[in-house]
From Swiss-Prot:
UniProt cross-references to PANTHER family, sorted A to Z: PHOSPHOLIPASE D (PTHR18896), PHOSPHOLIPASE D GAMMA 2-RELATED (PTHR18896:SF130)
Positions of modified residues (Phosphoserine): S692
Highest rank taxon of the organism: Eukaryota
Name recorded for this polypeptide: Phospholipase D gamma 3
Misc. comment: Presence of a putative myristoylation site MGXXXS (Gly-14).
Tagged with keyword Transcription: no
Enzyme active site: H376, K378, D383, H717, K719, D724
Binding site for a 1,2-diacyl-sn-glycero-3-phosphate: H376, Q572, H717
Length: 866
């Protein structure tokens, strides 16, 4: 057989079942092309409405394998998320179909066991933002390890652009362009619906009381709630400028960790916590350096002694160990074993939860999942006081883990607080330094509190995860399991149920509509259906031997497509849409977010409408910026930026504006950094001149440079987005494949808006809580507020913010050490008028620590870096 590698197929961020949004990753080399001649490449930006109905007369792909091994593996792993076919007693093919475009899989049917005439009748409504000549339907036979390609059907995108539905029986062709078996056909239908025909995206993100939120998700939109938005772990009164909202209200800056500590103290029934890391010695309240406030561990022990059910679900780092009194911290330094030991003889129940692979996964796939990926959700659920002496559920969701290194304020000190509020809480894993010398790594993050019906969905997520994690495994399965750790709220009359939980009605101008989203699969939760045919009704996607909830990605795509004025993003990572890069297209970083933003801007340019996107990321991912993994991530980040800017430049050329405007008039990337002159707070409240207690020869080179320059990046750990000052999305998910795929890191997020503070409701710019939050973040980053900042889509605002960030970068990079009133830095790359992204002259590497800013293509495990 002649093999002609024409495309790699990797799972994109598309749909499955009847879900509108969501996808997963899968790599596969399809070694043939079923068409002859070249076809025109078309940009498909909109949705593909697809039905994969049935196949007939498929060949028996299993006969050879079972003859070869004597059927020794027959039945092993064949019943996991599969449907029995018409030949359940016969050994034959276990077919399923993948749908792909630009080498990225956008849909997958469930597997039907032992069938040469499978019937799926499976619907996909898939968002696409791909340039391609063909859509591929690949029919495969699922094996115990991997799969075999039976054949493929190709639909030219040029035909789809006519807008007509293409449907019928299509021959399944092999590598020679011939039927894989006489009479073998696939019944399907497909229609392309371009963005301009989709009314869902034309009214803004939160267009009023009748909005249904993100359709086709596991958790629906919940109405009648309240939300508190947080920036950083703490904001001292009077440290940020006032922001005035509609109705004469002044925006109130929340104090996240103090609110969480207060919620713990006031809990009467339950405290449930999930985290990537939870560290018991952390102090949530640090006013006046008061040691009587107690640690997190002490607070939880006290509450458990009062009869409150305290459950803590933490990721079990596979590199940390505790055996016979000896322990290792682990590569990620999450302190999981230390936290478990602290609570061991208390009534606080701590469950260390490994990231398990799916039941039907191969040994290699399981090993990858269990060693590379994590449980990354950060939530706290408590009962709180409600009306009429009853209790209700309140949930905290966001990017802040309750562990060391996370407590910070908008001032983001480097040295001054090492002996006060950051005493015993020093964190800087970027190079070798100490709490005596510094600098600490400043930490910027976003978090939220949900009061209302959506909090019960956060509770449901915890319960589903706890039930799965507490299920006995290995030899423990021989014992009877009766874990009753979770409270049955339906048996506690004083706790309101979901139907009673609305904390505000739609007539209240301060009410919220809130929706909970996740990235998670059936290997991490209990409660997903066993039968994949039932996944459709639960808005779950079908992977191979696994069901997937990918609603965080769906929420991002929905919000970006609905944006009318601007997008503001803060995220720890920003990479994706590799299918549209100029190289490395088959990497598998297939989330749509970067391409959707670029196409949103391009469409606004063609319509000659105002629009801007502001994206804040860390200067570099946490760790040594010279290391191979971080250089590789920075390389992918550079490829993502390049793709976006070139897409925008092409739109400017198309409308003849390339001589007047440039891509950075619409899209800008920023990072955060700060400097301090040589002073430090001391415990008695005074400030003294600070000199390192040790001589420079005793310090490493990076530490010497950092102490001399007295500067460091502010680490952006945020995972949030504001759209048009009317919609906010905050959670634990990064903008990369790990967080958005659903089968890698487990994540959770909330999306919300105030229906009375929307463009549709007001007919003008909303000035509700989300407007106040965005302005407060800008005040933190820029050091002050100007009137131009109220309208981010205006060119005057874009250029003013860029100008200030460039001035801040020059101050950050200068030899002279000066206090920085603002922290927002222009990301240190050069973007020319044609959209080419290159090194900034004179700043090819990061100050002090080195490492190429645009990254390097160094050898490292791919799935670690995307």
């Amino acid at each position: 057989m002649a093999y002609h590698p024409v495309y790699n197929e990797t799972m994109s961020m598309g749909g499955g079942s009847s879900n509108e949004f969501g996808q997963w990753l899968d790599k596969q080399l399809v070694p043939f092309d079923t068409s002859s001649g070249s076809l025109r490449v078309e940009l498909l930006h909109g949705n593909l409405d697809i039905w994969v109905k049935e196949a007939k007369h498929l060949p028996n792909m299993d006969g050879f394998h079972n003859t070869l091994v004597g059927g020794m593996f027959f039945g092993l792993g064949r019943r996991n998320h599969k449907v029995d076919g018409e030949n359940s007693s016969k050994i034959t093919s276990d077919p399923y179909v993948t749908v792909s475009i630009s080498g990225a899989v956008i849909g997958r049917t469930f597997v039907i066991s032992n069938s040469e005439n499978p019937v799926w009748m499976q619907h996909f409504d898939v968002p696409v933002a791909h340039s391609a000549a063909k859509v591929h339907f690949v029919v495969k036979d699922s094996d115990i390890i991997g799969s075999q390609i039976i054949g493929a059907v190709e639909i030219p995108t040029e035909q789809l652009c006519s807008g007509n539905r293409i449907e019928g029986l299509f021959p399944i062709l092999n590598s020679r362009g011939k039927p894989c078996k006489q009479g073998a056909v696939l019944s399907l239908s497909i229609q392309y619906i371009p963005m301009e025909r989709m009314r869902l995206y034309q009214k803004g993100v939160g267009f009023g009381v009748e909005c249904v939120g993100v359709p086709g998700t596991y958790f629906p939109l919940r109405k009648g709630g309240r939300v508190t938005l947080y920036q950083d772990a703490h904001v001292d009164d009077g440290t940020l400028p006032s922001v005035h909202l509609d109705g004469g209200i002044q925006y109130r800056h929340g104090k996240c960790w103090e609110d969480m500590a207060d919620a713990i103290r006031r809990a009467r029934r339950l405290i449930y916590i999930t985290g990537w890391s939870v560290f018991h010695p952390v102090r949530l309240v640090r006013r006046n350096n008061d040691p009587t406030q107690g640690t997190l561990g002490e607070l939880l022990k006290v509450k458990s002694q009062e009869g409150v059910r305290v459950l803590v679900l933490v990721w079990d780092d596979p590199t940390s160990r505790s055996l016979l009194g000896f322990s290792t911290k682990g590569l990620m330094n999450t302190s999981d074993e230390e936290t478990r030991r602290f609570f061991k003889h208390s009534s606080v129940q701590v469950l260390l939860c490994p990231r398990y692979g799916g039941k039907g996964h191969s040994f290699i796939k399981k090993s990858e999942v269990e060693t590379i990926y994590t449980h990354h959700q950060k939530t706290m659920i408590v009962d709180a006081e409600a009306a009429q002496n009853r209790r209700k559920i309140v949930a905290f969701v966001g990017g802040l883990d309750l562990c060391n290194g996370r407590f910070d304020t908008p001032k983001h000190p480097l040295f001054r607080t090492l002996k006060t509020i950051h005493k015993d809480d020093f964190h800087n894993p970027n190079f070798v330094t100490t709490a005596d010398d510094g600098p600490r790594e400043p930490w910027h993050d976003l978090h939220s509190k949900i009061d209302g019906p959506a909090a019960y969905d956060v509770l449901a997520n915890f319960e589903e995860r706890w039930m799965k994690a507490s299920k006995p495994r290995g030899i423990g399965r021989l014992r009877t399991s009766s874990d009753d750790s979770l409270l049955r709220l339906d048996r506690i009359p004083d706790i309101m149920g979901l139907s009673e939980a609305s904390s505000a009605n739609d007539n209240d101008p301060e009410s919220w509509h809130v929706q909970v989203f996740r990235s998670i699969d059936s290997s991490s939760v209990k409660g997903f259906p066993k039968d994949p045919k039932e996944a459709t009704g639960r808005n779950l996607l079908c992977g191979k031997n696994i069901l997937i909830d990918m609603s965080i990605h769906a929420a991002y795509v929905k919000a970006i497509r609905s944006a009318q004025h601007f997008i503001y993003i803060e995220n720890q990572y920003f990479l994706g849409s590799s299918f549209n890069w100029d190289s490395n297209k088959n990497l598998g970083a297939n989330n749509l977010i970067p391409m959707e933003i670029a196409l949103k801007i391009a469409n606004k340019i063609r319509a000659r409408e105002k629009f801007a996107a502001y994206i804040v990321i860390p200067m570099w991912p946490e760790g040594a910026p010279t290391s191979n993994p971080i250089q590789r991530i920075l390389y992918w980040q550079h490829k993502t930026m390049q793709m976006m800017y070139q897409t925008i430049y092409k739109a400017l050329v198309e409308v003849g504006l390339d001589g007047q405007l440039e891509p950075q008039d619409f899209l800008n990337f920023f990072c955060l950094g700060t400097r301090e002159v040589g002073t430090r707070e001391v415990p008695d409240g005074t400030v003294s001149v600070y000199n390192s207690p040790r001589k420079p020869p005793q310090l490493n080179a990076a530490q010497v440079q950092a102490l001399k320059s007295r500067r460091f990046m502010i680490y952006v750990h945020s995972k949030g987005m504001v759209v048009d000052d009317e919609f906010v999305l905050i959670g634990s998910a990064n903008i990369n494949q790990r967080s958005l795929e659903g089968t890698r890191d487990t994540e959770i997020a909330m999306g919300g808006y105030q229906p009375h503070h929307s463009w549709a409701k007001k007919g003008s710019r909303p000035r509700g809580q989300i407007f106040g939050y965005r302005m407060s973040l800008w005040a933190e980053h820029l050091g002050f507020l100007e009137q131009e900042f109220e309208e981010p889509e205006n060119m005057e605002c874009v250029r003013r913010v860029r100008q200030l960030s460039e001035l801040n970068w020059r101050q950050y990079a200068a030899e002279e050490v000066t206090e920085m009133p603002g922290h927002l830095l222009k990301y240190p790359v050069q973007v020319d008028r044609t959209g080419k992204v290159s090194s900034l002259p004179g700043y090819e590497t990061f100050p002090d620590l080195g490492g190429k800013i645009i990254g390097s293509f160094l050898v490292v495990e791919e799935n670690l870096t995307i």
